[in-house]
Structures are given as structure tokens and as C-alpha cells.
């Protein structure tokens, strides 16, 4: 159930170039039960910047009432958020959206989790949930260069983990699909989050597989009211049918929406 709460900053640190790990605490965490959901953060007091920032939920610890989110500090809003210190309060709205269907993976099956850039974080909580129910996980994490690689070791604790960098400075040179081809990776179910180009490449390969993708879109309200994040359905060539990424997604079955 969505709630709005002022949450306390437990810790914040830069874990890669311009990539920050922020841990917040509050009872709102008890509502975070679906990996792949996101929160809307009010990054500063006052009206500037006006819009909240959507940030995915990376890790949930309900015993401590803490959750972790990772984000890239690149615009005015996220750069402001990066200045928040331990003990300060952050206005959080969430959890929002529909996450990854963990129930679609069965114990003993192999799940392939593919993340690109800042699309990697929500896969961490998902991976933990899958491992807990006896699913074998394989991770492929794609980044531009080694300076922005993060959470490789954390994912490796859960299952086989491969990294691809576009410039070849870490792991396999190229894209996540190059890793799949090089190692001949097979799987029963696919979960993915990242840039559209990556999602399109995966859709082109695995449209007949059981697969789910999370779309990264710039969202305004986060609750389906402003229509800033609509995407059209593939089954309707007229373009009149659509779904809203923030409320109907951000996770969709592969092949359902136009990428």
C-alpha cells in the first residue's frame, strides 16, 4: 500500500563514479514486498526542483525498517539528494508500481537477470528473493566503463555473475548479449531492467521465452494521473491502447508494450 513518509538517512556513500548508495529507515519499509517497485523522492525542501525523482528499490531489510536505493547523481535533483547526510530526513512516496513476478520462477529452475547501468539495482532484491525460494540465478551486468561498475561482488554472492563494459575496461568487452553468446548461457526465465536499446535486443531474441522487463522512464506524478509515461501496446497497431509505466508497470511481460 502506497504511503508518504519522512524517512531518516541511515547512511549515504558514493560507491562508483557518480553512483550513490542511500539507506533510509522508516515504517514504510513494511509495505515493500515486491522487488522491482520504486519510490518517489522529494529531493529538496521548497518547490525547486518541483518534481519528485523516481528511484528503484535495491534492497529491503524489514527487520531494521531499512531500504537501500542506488542512483546516479547527474541532474540538479539527484545532485541535491547526494548531499543528504546521516540523520537528515527525506520525503518518500511509495512503494509504487508493479514489480517482478517472483512466483513465475520455480524452485530448481534457472533465472537469468540482466541489468544495464542504473537498471541494475532493482535486480539485487529480486535475486535475493529468487535464491530464497530455491531458484538458481545468473546475473549479467552491463556498464559503459569500469569506473561505473557497482555491486558485482554482492551479486556474485548470490550466483554466477558476469560483467560487460562497452569499452572493455572490465569484464567482457561489448554488451550483455555478447556475454550470453560467449558463454552459451541458457535459462528458464528472464528478468531485465536497463536502457531501451538493451531491452529491445533481448526482446528480439527471447520474445517466445518467459521473460519480464522493467522500463526506465522519466515520470512526473508516479501514480498514473499525469500520463507522462505512457507506452503503447504491441497488440494494437492503431496506437490507441496504452499502459502507464508508473502504475501499470514498470515491469511488463516481454512483447507486451512497444519499446
From Swiss-Prot:
Pfam families: DHODB_Fe-S_bind, NAD_binding_1. Residues 2-102 form the FAD-binding FR-type domain. [2Fe-2S] cluster binds at residues 221, 226, 229, 246. Its cofactor is [2Fe-2S] cluster; FAD. One of its GO terms (biological process) is 'de novo' UMP biosynthetic process. Keywords: 2Fe-2S, Electron transport, FAD, Flavoprotein, Iron, Iron-sulfur, Metal-binding, Pyrimidine biosynthesis, Transport. InterPro entries: Cyt_c3_hydrogenase_gsu, Dihydroorotate_DH_ele_sf, Dihydroorotate_DH_Fe-S-bd, Dihydroorotate_DHASE_ETsu, FAD-bd_FR_type, FNR_nucleotide-bd, OxRdtase_FAD/NAD-bd, PyrK_electron_transfer. GO terms for molecular function: 2 iron, 2 sulfur cluster binding; electron transfer activity; flavin adenine dinucleotide binding; metal ion binding; oxidoreductase activity. Binds 1 [2Fe-2S] cluster per subunit. Binds 1 FAD per subunit. The keyword Cell membrane does not apply. The keyword Nucleotidyltransferase does not apply. FAD binds at residues 53-56, 70-72, 77-78. Pathway: Pyrimidine metabolism; UMP biosynthesis via de novo pathway; orotate from (S)-dihydroorotate (NAD(+) route): step 1/1. It comes from the Bacteria. PANTHER family: DIHYDROOROTATE DEHYDROGENASE B (NAD(+)), ELECTRON TRANSFER SUBUNIT, DIHYDROOROTATE DEHYDROGENASE B (NAD(+)), ELECTRON TRANSFER SUBUNIT-RELATED. Belongs to the PyrK family. Responsible for channeling the electrons from the oxidation of dihydroorotate from the FMN redox center in the PyrD type B subunit to the ultimate electron acceptor NAD(+). Heterotetramer of 2 PyrK and 2 PyrD type B subunits. This is Dihydroorotate dehydrogenase B (NAD(+)), electron transfer subunit. The gene is pyrK.
